[in-house]
């Protein structure tokens, strides 16, 4: 909202229903590389500071997806530090319910005792990182099956489009 001033329109047009418009004012606009670029430039110094303060952890980020890898206690401390930096310096707010902890070897109880916030989901099977699966063979297989199912549904929608131009 601050950068664009107005909500963006997301328009759907479906046979028998007509045109439907949904207003969206959250995050950068889809396809707006400028907004994403500015966001990345803004958080980069904070991510670098976090990495410098926690040298035994690896901090990976792509836009607003931040991943902290390391021993449970240090990773939990780094997460809390990231929450502080993001809130104090950018007036942002992390949503624990949108965060995940992947621990292939340690139980949920162990990572909770290390300081992981209670609102963060814990998985010992796997998680999604930058759009792809990371985890057990079963997790990756189920992830791939889900993608195939989604693409199959997308093809059903595309098939209903009246022109080839609208399909691209």
What do these predicted regions represent?
Residues 1-168:
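Nucleic-acid-interacting cores, centered on viral/eukaryotic replication and modification enzymes
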């Amino acid at each position: 909202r601050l950068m664009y001033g107005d909500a963006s329109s997301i328009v759907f047009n479906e046979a028998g229903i007509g045109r439907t418009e949904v207003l969206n004012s959250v995050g950068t606009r889809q396809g707006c590389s400028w907004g994403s670029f500015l966001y990345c430039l803004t958080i980069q110094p904070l991510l670098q500071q976090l990495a410098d303060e926690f040298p035994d952890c690896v901090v990976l980020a792509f836009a607003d997806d931040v991943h902290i890898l390391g021993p449970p206690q240090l990773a939990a401390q780094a997460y809390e530090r990231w929450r502080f930096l993001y809130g104090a310096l950018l007036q942002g707010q992390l949503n624990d319910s949108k965060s995940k902890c992947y621990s292939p070897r340690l139980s949920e109880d162990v990572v909770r005792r290390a300081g992981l916030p209670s609102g963060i989901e814990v998985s010992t099977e796997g998680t999604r990182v930058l759009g792809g699966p990371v985890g057990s063979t079963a997790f990756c297989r189920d992830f791939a099956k889900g993608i195939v199912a989604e693409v199959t549904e997308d093809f059903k929608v595309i098939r209903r489009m009246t022109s080839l131009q609208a399909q691209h």
